[in-house]
Amino acid sequence: MNEYMRGTVAPALVYERDLEIVPPDLELALMFALLEYDKHRHEQYREAQYVFFSKMLWPLNLIQAGAENYLGIDGLSFFDLQFKITKFLDTKLLAELDRAINDHETRIELISKYITEINLPLKKDIKIKGIIGPEILHGLVPLIKLAADKPLTSDKLDSMTSTDDLIQVVNQYSQVLKELEETISKWHNFQTKLSQKIKNWRVQYSNQEDSAALKELEEKFTELDKKISEKIWNCRNEIDYLFHWALSGHTLNMVIPINKIWISMYLAGIILPNNNEKFLLLPPSIVSSNITATRWVPVDSFHSSFYKILKEKVEAMLDSQTPLTQKIVDSCKAQNLFLKEDANKLISRGYQRVREKKLMEPKYIEVVKGDWQKASEYLKS
């Protein structure tokens, strides 16, 4: 990797009280302590052997989608948008409304047919690869605001998306929104046309004998009209949901159309006693001022849904052993912190800071330091 390469890098660890970035030595010490906490609280991981522990930079693209909003697009395609949107009726059915229908039974049959069709799951599957979900994206906002231009000296993961890919994702997203607006328009037009048809039919129910038939027609029309309104409401909710997947440029303090941010995270590979490989991700976190005795590491998440979803999604993707898994593992092994003398010195200074700041009880500091040393010596042997 070119040591002179630079990029906009978001921190892995910040203080909760003021979002100040934690210095590198303290960051490494606390993130490894968090890893140890994560490892020891799962019985099946306690006897596992470390393979690597690395800091990695995950490529995140923020690209303008519309006048003010930005989509977050994952450069490694861990994430995607999978969704069902409401469709309109088969256009062949609409032609029947143009026919001249003069008898009551045929009118009721037609309206009943529309009701039956509308009761079907009129849905279309949508999948847009790479879009990051709102829980992750909103959770990253504080970090994105703290991102700064830095040398890319950590384990930079090469993005698998080109500028053309990013534009294609935005176009797909915009097309889905446009399609939903068009579907709303179609439902409105159908509703208006149907209402006019019913209005024309009403005048033909003029005598006393037709009152029961007119009542039946009105009831069927009211039922159908209500269902059409529900479809329109569904479409509007789907549009609102899709808008929730984007962030305002004002929220991000961004004005340029395409922004690339590197999100700092830590990843460990371990071998379980049954020889299965497992990956443990440490997403960006905060140094909390409120840690209980049962949770002895002073590191917590920005909010639980962000941390949990990001951690589980990436770990599951890596555990599935895709070609991307091997690419990331090879990259992390090449930057294995257990094997770097600079990292050993850095973490020693970090635990000295932890002790001075009284961030952890001394007994836990010694356990974690011992585990680092054992892993380092084992992998160097």
Language model segments and positions:
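Soluble extracytoplasmic regions of secretory-pathway and membrane proteins
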Residues: 1-381
